């Protein structure tokens, strides 16, 4: 949008909404007309209007962008093309003319002429007519002050995420009491969002220009920003100390990749405003371009404010005067007074809508994507662009005809889609209002966030026409605008799951400074879904990737466009609009997913019944075993004979279809009885032997049976009292005189068995199932447990459960052997079967390895009845073929089947071949793919009815409305959705989803999350009691306080249980299910725990803070369980609480700590633990402070600038994980806690152009462990760090490895040891000590060197020795590329070395240094007569005990000059080593900081070359190596190193054990050849051997010059050694 060419006047104002977290950023687009252009006021000829009315008409025409002659004054504002945005503008213009009217009156007007007449009838509204000769600004521009009016339209870009690596207002930021109390409600809310979710509520605005206009823009912006009061003080502390009003930085890049990268970098770190210019230098220069990026916190501006500023900038560019706006704090005070005076009206308004808001649904019923690895606290957003399918012209025609605004159509379309996706007739989402319609001075001109977001709640009646709905929606919007000044204190909440924004463009300018690309805006958001409507009708759907998948949002966008199409015919009813949203493509997808095209799901496909199938099996395999119990068995022929005898007798007592109850005792005669009942034409009903007699009596009575069958004479005592006749199978089978008959034709439509299930009230429901359903179900081999001749099927399920039906008839209908339980062990027979059905609870306690036959891969195991957990899936599917089956009894045993595999997500799978499945809403309409609805089962498997329950049967068994062939479907009451690959994901019962205090809660999901958060709890039962949740947990020994504290950290406040009961077992219903009603009663009887009195100093401090912030009287008693929320605290007061406590403890208490610990004892314990809490930093002239970096860090930063993608500066640790011994979750938690407590690990290194130096900034979020399945250790160890954008540390936990990688800029080996020590301690349950001393307040770096030290170094290094004779000297370093070569020092040499070191005062480091100094001569050049060389060693540089426990980089390089030759009188070995030892001791004794040494010697640093020395030598003893370990069982330290070369040559000795010494040569491949390295690998062990054997110095040199033929050194392959446990090398 052009930035100049603005006329002197004639601005018109429009609002444009852009969504941000819980708010909208409202841009004002200003249209303009040439100031002195003649305006044709074409009034209707039959009407005479006074001058005042003419001015209003002129203003109206300007607002609507039409000629006055085109206005129809006999119609309303909307009919003339007005909308809510232009209404705001017209009200503002009228106000400037002295006419007061409301937005509601103008929007609801139906006759403009009458409106104007009424307005101007009052003297108070008479408009002063200007003198025509007056040369002042035209009244067509009511905002023609020197401040100007908003004028630029800025296209919206996608909302973007804020990564933890970016630098923003941190969680540890502390607000002063003054600042907190002086904030407006909106500012406090925005700041609260930033503190709780760092990086949110920051706006980035981009404009791209020709490079040569940037200086003009800079001057204009500087003038404007420095003039506005709101930028003059810090919102964090209310002061202007060290506050830069205007910050401007510039960076120049030469490639497009660098340019794009700079544009993507988000840098704002505080509540401030900042500018950054990215210059892209191109050839030719005229093609260069520059992008100006304005970053500003939303607590400083809203969109209206931004456009006021834009307008002033344009005026400044043209040299026009600029007048600052009024003080925001002054305007805010007036607004507060207004709110107080009108509070009762606001309270009354929202109280009137409270019931509707409570019932409204705003949450899309879409599943969250499955997370990969560990969950992250980072809010990540992506955008989906939805192209328009309906033009604005079409919609405008509809809107004009109905007298509503265009935006009403878009709001209505989203309401339709939201109603479908929320399965609710009442929906709510966010709507924004400018907040500038109050009749208060300064509201129109002030810069500051006056914007407000209100809940828009709508009810969609299906019988209502779309046009009536549009009109009602428009009226609702008008009404809402009248209360845009209200805040949540008036009784509403801003809990929006979605929100919509409209974009309105402005005109283009024809001259002046103009952007060469359309401007755009990026902004952070914590609203899960925002819909931004573009000017052409397209939409941008910006969504949180943690909450929605891209496929779901793409589909959502299509439905939104389809809704707009449906609204083009507004006469149709809302029901038709909702039904029309499901398109043909999705309908076809759903039909395919649901198995709707298969005839196998229909009754016409069934030609057999259970009896004919059994008899066919008998005829084919008469002598095969049919049923076995221990040593007793029956063949198919015997079973058929016995069952035939039972049937012959039964026919004398029953009619076809009569129910016969059978005593189910798991005996062979029980099976005989079942088949006898069916062969007689009866219906089998089991009376479980294990049930109480009262329950058996109830079932018998409900079944309608008059006859009772028992397997044996000993069972007669179980006969129900109402039984008319008792028959004994044991007697019946002995009668060989009865005729044995077989069924002449199948009867699939007849009833087969009656199975009782428990209802929600505990009263059993009898489900009547048909032959055809079970025959259809078991027709598939995989479904029927692979039952066939030769296979053995276990009978293990409860005889009262339809799982036993599946076992029995799968086997007996297809010739398999049914194996019954025998003996005392109910699972013993599993060792002798090929197929078995288990519940997941059984599988959890059983070990497949304990059952010889069951543990084979060919064995098929089916899990039914409960959700399958991942651990059960993994353990069992590794050893056998495992299936998950789902289906209620009413759907005949099973509806879906899914083979499970190790470490793959558990689902219930697609429909089985004989079932149709639908997922429907409450109106029994198909929901779109991926949307959560209720699962329905349709087709041949649907049972007949509930016996004796016609009302419940009518409710649950209904006609199939999808496949209309006269069949029925069953309403399961289970919630689920279709996955992308057509599998059903079952989420639990619908009656476990509730609405509590305005929030929709899934109680099953909450139970799962609680168990996951606190593994010591084995089960959770959650239920509702009034407006609170009650939780019962197992076992009774659980630490309830610890559980409560942990749950409060992972669940939102409204989902946290108010009472928690620890029980030995849950109360159950008669059917054995959890009795939630009984749990609620137990909770009601239990007293509310008030905790104890406050005793510890921290508890008292927190209690005092509670009392102060909440203004509690002395009569309010506080105790350890006192809750901040229950005492009246809310999110905004948490800001002040965090500040108050931080000041009290002199440590930064982040907002998230306060938010996660609501109770006094929990919060006090969290603060006492010290985890993640940093000391409040005070300016210490002797410490680094918050932003300064240490000189050694600066040294490494400069090295990184040579090649930031290098991995050579990575410090790493890796351990191999024993899966049986290591608790990965605990390891991840321990590592996260340790990384979070050291703030230096959040460092970002940023070059500040203003400061002219590199500064440290902090990410608000601590680094987090990445949990992955697999990892490539070499790739992970060598991933480079981006110092400005990412954390300087990362940790990965895979199935096999734990890898910790740190940039050398923040770590040395001591730091690595500290971190590993703390991780080990925390992993094993130890507590971590507080951190009294941090890297940032270390005073070490400001120590001044003594003159004695400096004199030493002048003498030592004043003139450096010649290096032309050394290996590697001739090469030119181009970077930090390099390799590592590894070899083993011969064990005999290492043993001699260890013996020598024990007998002398020489250290291993000194001996190694002496060795390397002798080996570096290049054989191709003449050898010097003496040794004179400078080598480097690592200097720990930790000079105090407290420094030894500080995480950070202290290690510095230290030069050691070794000079020894012919002038030395004693050339013995001891003399040479003594010289080396003295040299090392002297260097260490006179050590000064590296930067001080270089400055003193006046040596410049030119990376990658290293000053003073090129070779570094280090020796890691075995004890040192042991410090680099996680001291916990199952973690084995591996050998690692990073790729590349930090120096020309690094010689690193590592003692792996008492007899293994490894030598790694890290070398620059531009300087050393492979032959050089091979020579060093031969020389170094040889020199070491000679030195420890007392060989004279001269002889050693001669030997190295002409080495003898010796045993070659054992060279190790780097790819073999890397990643190998140290003990295995």
UniProtKB/Swiss-Prot annotation:
Keywords annotated in UniProt: Ligase, Phosphopantetheine, Phosphoprotein, Repeat
Any GO CC annotation of this UniProt entry: cytoplasm
UniProt pathway annotation: Mycotoxin biosynthesis
Region (Disordered): 127-157
Region of interest (Adenylation), residue spans: 614-997
UniProt region (Condensation 2), positions on chain: 1195-1585
Annotated segments matching region Condensation 1: 286-567
Carrier domain residues: 47-123, 1096-1171
The organism's place on the tree of life at top rank: Eukaryota
Keyword Metal-binding included in the entry's annotation: no
Alphabetized GO MF terms: ligase activity; phosphopantetheine binding
Classification via PROSITE patterns: AMP_BINDING, CARRIER, PHOSPHOPANTETHEINE
Disruption phenotype: Completely abrogates the biosynthesis of aspirochlorine, but also of the intermediate dechloroaspirochlorine.
Keyword Transcription in annotation: no
O-(pantetheine 4'-phosphoryl)serine sites (modified residues): 84, 1131
GO biological-process terms attached to the record: amino acid activation for nonribosomal peptide biosynthetic process; secondary metabolite biosynthetic process
Enzyme Commission number, as recorded: 6.3.2.-
Top-level EC class as recorded in UniProt: ligase
Record-stated family: Belongs to the NRP synthetase family.
Protein purpose: Nonribosomal peptide synthetase; part of the gene cluster that mediates the biosynthesis of aspirochlorine (or antibiotic A30641), an unusual halogenated spiro compound with distinctive antifungal properties due to selective inhibition of protein biosynthesis, and which is also active against bacteria, viruses, and murine tumor cells. The non-ribosomal peptide synthetase (NRPS) aclP is responsible the formation of the diketopiperazine (DKP) core from the condensation of 2 phenylalanine residues.
Domain topic, free-text comment: NRP synthetases are composed of discrete domains (adenylation (A), thiolation (T) or peptidyl carrier protein (PCP) and condensation (C) domains) which when grouped together are referred to as a single module. Each module is responsible for the recognition (via the A domain) and incorporation of a single amino acid into the growing peptide product. Thus, an NRP synthetase is generally composed of one or more modules and can terminate in a thioesterase domain (TE) that releases the newly synthesized peptide from the enzyme.
Protein name: Nonribosomal peptide synthetase aclP
Lineage: Eukaryota, Fungi, Dikarya, Ascomycota, Pezizomycotina
